[in-house]
Amino acid sequence: VLAVVLMLLASVAFPAEAQAIPESSALYRLQLERETARQFGLDAPVARIAAQIHQESGWRPTAQSPFAQGLAQFTPATAKWLPQVCPEVGPPDPWDSSWSLRAITCYDAWLHRRVRAQPAGRALDECSRWAYTLRAYNGGEGWLNRERAKAAAAGANANDWRQVEKYRVRADWAHKENIGYPRRILLVLEPRYLRAGWPGKAACG
């Protein structure tokens, strides 16, 4: 009887979780796993970057916003610049899904390597490091670094993403969008993809 009950529960829970993830993601999963492993190694954060793509475009390669294009929502300027630090992505083409998957994984890895613990405060944990990586992707590395510096100058811990959220040097609307970006990816969407069986482990467990 218990086995039957468990099977029924699974049959109810799995479709609900699957419905929360766009079906189109299955078309890109294998390439995303390959590209993420290429950039991050065997413990690649596939579910995390899948969650980021979900946030960016809902897995729609034709997605377009006023300033960004494609699956990973690169601006034309960033797409043009990216091969300077990620030559392996090839000629910029945000509308091409294969290019976008190469680009988002390489750019995330590049930004992740550049996040440094500031001298004061506790060590930089992986949750904060990824929050800063995602904020840099979304709103620019320079703005983020200035806000971390402002937090440190005020006596806050610049290595704690929650403390840094309180400090702003950009427009209020841009700051709200930027701090909300990693919150949704790390706290809402990544756990959803992990529960659905995408590889990785939670950065903010």
Task: Locate each region found by the language model.
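Bacterial N-terminal signal peptides
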Residues: A3-S11
